[in-house]
């Protein structure tokens, strides 16, 4: 039989607990299913708490701040940045430390984390009295984000997209002529010759260094 993993805080209160693996249903809190290639598909399932609120998980195209009852894909997409760290109103933070594509389901009756292809179960949990304490413990485990440079806090000019060097510079020159402050101008995709060839296309951007020098002089 499986041991049931339970996490408590310093007050003896249960923060998170795996589902029971006993009974006629023969459920497994940690379920490994062999797949082709030698890896496993993995499900890890915990009991849910009706009074719990869940926050975090990065950037998704959805309207909910409280993630309770939400299902999220654990994968990056255009405008979707999956950061598999969730902070609970019960006073803990949970990091799913697994690079595999998967899903998480914060259901009403249980919470399930899924990895489609993995070699092992790996997650990190921390507790704290405040969100700041939990965030600090998370940062100490994963690394602190660098301070954003000052120019990154100003106005960004971005569009989809500038098709050549002269078009980009003409927009920047217009800002300068109108005395409008601008800190960043984004040269978005397809400035390269072919996908995966990350350099300026010389036909449309004949002198990138001169372009950068002029932008810096503004």
Q: At which residue positions do the language-model features occur?
A:
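Catalytic and substrate-binding clefts that recognize carbohydrates or anionic sugar/phosphate headgroups
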Residues: 1-149, 159-160, 165, 172-177
